[in-house]
Swiss-Prot record:
PANTHER family: UPF0210 PROTEIN MJ1665 (PTHR37560:SF1), UPF0210 PROTEIN SPR0218 (PTHR37560). This is UPF0210 protein Mevan_0738. Belongs to the UPF0210 family. Disulfide bonds: none annotated. CDD domains: RNR_PFL_like_DUF711. Transmembrane segments: none annotated. InterPro entries: UPF0210. It comes from Methanococcus vannielii (strain ATCC 35089 / DSM 1224 / JCM 13029 / OCM 148 / SB). Gene3D superfamilies: 3.20.70.20.
Length: 458
């Protein structure tokens, strides 16, 4: 039985504190779509996704209205294209292979537009040990894909705790990100490319979502959001000790996750597909008050990025996980606190006043998900430096047995102190400083960083 206070609290969360379901993502298996003929492959992909997801947007809107809970994004993730395109590329030269990969990406883009979803993810390759010939072609095709599509997201897993770090792939992804930045307006294509260590197979969030090879035929994964709610709770706890803050965040995360599970299961039931997981991640937006940085500042930091920030973030991340895990039997995805610079008004302010830099963000990624996210850097940054930043972040994930990722945006013609404006959820990104000392010789060595001793768990 709900008491009036709880009902009013929920209304307040939604109306004033930006509580919403950030995404309901339909994961679709495409392994049965593989074909030697490119046209048949595209037809199979189109038919399967539209038959399963044709009503996704309409269903999510109906569930949203039923419960009065906003569902901000409706998305689709698919089996990594690198796993299904091999037979199609047999006998083709490199240029033809790249073009064939791009054609599949264009088909995904058409599906996203026809179905009405915000993004479609899964233009992906899993190359944490080595890349197959078709995966190399897929990776090579990413910049061209980004010039020809609007809604397709690409991701590449270059490292795992069990396999180590594929430094050939790290080097290549630095080059791909640089090339993409130069051929898309304001480097917007880079906002749709993620490089992973320990990529989860059931992530509902873009740009890194794909439907993992261990997943079933179709599944709904839900991602919740609620930084504004958590901030409001923490602001009421002035003078209270850290344990009290942790306890109250846990209680709040429980309520948020319960809501996510309710909505996710309802959408899955309506679409007649399995319910997968709830991703517990606190995902900020550029809206005032909907900020991870503001939560940390409410704990007593003058500015996010000052000394104590990593400890405060660790507290937040752990409390959210504990509260969320109690609320749902099936927790997955990234499940932590996101710290994307361009999508968080508090982070942007911290960069502007000099409290937050790239090195501090890297330290913060040791205790939260997911990594160096939506960070704009000078357009003159060489590809080897982009690769080196990726390598550092992959090492953090590999050693700590956690997911880490990099979404860097080298913006042509922009330098430190300037901004790039994307609008909407992607927000505004201040150009952040990177070291000018070279990492080129290290990156050019290639090879594979061996898996750490922590990987020997059997």
């Amino acid at each position: 039985m709900y008491v009036p206070e709880e009902i009013i609290e929920t209304v307040r969360m939604i109306e004033y504190q930006h509580l919403d379901i950030r995404t309901t993502t339909l994961g679709v298996n495409l392994k049965d779509c593989a074909d030697k003929d490119l046209d048949l492959l595209k037809e199979n992909i189109y038919d399967k996704i539209t038959s399963l997801g044709g009503n996704l947007v309409e269903t999510a809107e109906k569930v949203s209205q039923k419960y009065g809970i906003p569902i901000v994004n409706k998305r689709i993730s698919v089996t990594p294209i690198g796993l299904i395109i091999g037979s199609t590329l047999k006998g083709l030269n490199e240029e033809e292979s790249v073009d064939a990969c791009v054609e599949v990406g264009i088909t995904l883009d058409k599906i996203a537009k026809d179905v009405g979803v915000d993004f479609i993810g899964g233009y992906s390759a899993l190359v944490h040990k080595r890349a197959t010939p078709e995966e190399k072609m897929l990776i090579r095709s990413i910049p061209k894909l980004m010039t020809k599509t609007d809604k397709v997201c690409a991701s590449v897993n270059v490292a795992t705790t069990k396999s180590g770090i594929n430094m050939y792939a790290v080097k290549k992804m630095g080059e791909i990100i640089k090339e993409t930045s130069e051929c898309t307006k304001d480097a917007i294509g880079c906002a749709k490319i993620v490089v992973f260590c320990n990529a989860p197979e059931d992530n509902p969030f873009m740009a890194g979502a794909f439907h993992g090879p261990g997943e079933g035929d179709a599944v709904i994964n839900a991602g919740v959001s609620g930084p504004g709610v958590v901030r409001a709770v923490v602001e009421k706890l002035k003078g209270k000790d850290i344990g009290t803050i942790s306890e109250e965040i846990k209680k709040t995360a429980f309520k948020i996750t319960r809501m996510g599970e309710l909505v996710g299961r309802e959408v899955a039931n309506e679409l007649n597909v399995d319910f997968g997981i709830v991703d517990l991640s606190l995902a900020p937006t550029p809206a005032p008050g909907d900020s991870i940085a503001n939560i940390l500042e409410a704990m007593g930091l003058e500015r996010c990025g000052t000394h104590g920030t990593t400890a405060a973030l660790a507290l937040l991340n752990d409390a959210v996980k504990k509260g969320g895990a109690m609320a749902s039997s099936y927790v997955g995805g990234l499940s932590g606190a996101f710290i994307p610079v361009s999508e968080d008004a508090g982070m942007i302010e911290a960069v502007e006043v000099g409290a937050l830099n790239l090195s501090k963000l890297e330290a913060m990624t040791c205790v939260c998900s997911v990594g160096l996210d939506m960070i704009a850097i000078p357009g003159k940054t060489p590809a080897s430096t982009v690769s080196a930043i990726i390598a550092d972040e992959m090492a953090i994930g590999m050693i700590n047995k956690k997911t880490t990722a990099v979404r860097l945006i080298p913006v042509p013609g922009k330098d430190v102190g300037e901004y790039v404006e994307y609008g909407g959820l992607l927000g505004t990104a201040p150009i952040m400083e990177v070291f000018e000392f070279s990492s080129e010789e290290f990156i050019n060595r290639g090879g594979r960083i061996p898996a750490p001793i922590q990987s020997l768990t059997n």
